[in-house]
Amino acid sequence: MTPILTTSLPLPLHSQGKVRDTYRLSDRELLMVATDRISAFDVVLPTPIPEKGRVLNQLSLAWFRETAGLVRNHLAPDLSIPTSVLSEQPDLEQRSMRVVMAEPILFECVVRGYISGSGWKDYQRSGSIAGERLPGGLRESDRLPEPVFTPATKATSGHDENISPAELAHRTGRELAQTLERLSLSLYGFAAERALQSGLILADTKFEFGFHGGDVILIDELLTPDSSRFWDAQRYRPGGPQPSFDKQFVRDYLEQVGWNKQPPAPPLPDEVVEGTSVRYLEALRRLGPAGPREPRGVRSERLRRHVPS
């Protein structure tokens, strides 16, 4: 299947993000379309990942439905997409999500259940994450005593900035900050248990919220390989990096080639593209309502080739 880098629908373009093109359906609703673009270190890469947008959209839809009892989200009451909108690009249907308009809260709500990524780097430097002191002697990928809420600014350009919960409260007000932390920790706890039932560890994840009708609701994407770290529970061995089903594979490659993390980003080689696509499809197979449409033998062979045991 040909990867999709850009879209062009007969609707007003509301915004274009790193991955999604968002169109205005009406004064109250938007259509979010997930492309195959991929970003790393806050920079969009020139090479698309086939099927990635479909995986992101299908997983987000499934998680939004499954967590609706915990927190309201931006899914529209009617999720059907007018036939005329996709008549020229019918392959976008599984990549499209109809949502209500909300006012974004411009902070990312990150929850870490395990110490990895930037959290591990912060701990090595200071013994803490987001200003919260952690026990000494932790190894990379260790499970934390309790999940930690580590918010970050949401930069329109450039790199996001990690901040402490206290700084979040200073910027948003104490009541809103407490609401964001409570909802984020509740969602993480639910999703971590659900992922483990599918053989995956939810190491950390990012939530985004907005205001709609005076309420705080979940927006953007939810518990996807773009916004989360998913590890294979059967192969979990703390003390170093873990085999994962997310875009860490791309980050690792970019670190290896010595990219300075400033645009333009280098192109990805074919083996990294296919390896990333395989990881995303495996996450969908395990977590989503319907897995990738390929025979199990083909999937297993591709998985063995790119995610060795």
Regions inferred by a protein language model and the residue ranges of each:
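Hydrophobic/aromatic-rich, well-ordered segments within soluble, folded domains that form packed cores
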Residues: L13, D21-L25, L200-A203, F207, ...
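C-terminal helix-cap and adjacent tail motif
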Residues: L222-L287
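A long amphipathic alpha-helix within ATP-dependent nucleotide-binding catalytic cores
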Residues: T172-A203
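A short mid-domain helix/strand-loop element embedded in enzyme catalytic domains
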Residues: R143-R174
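Active-site loop/lid in soluble adenylation, ligation, and acyl-transfer enzymes
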Residues: M1-A152, K261-P267, E271-P308
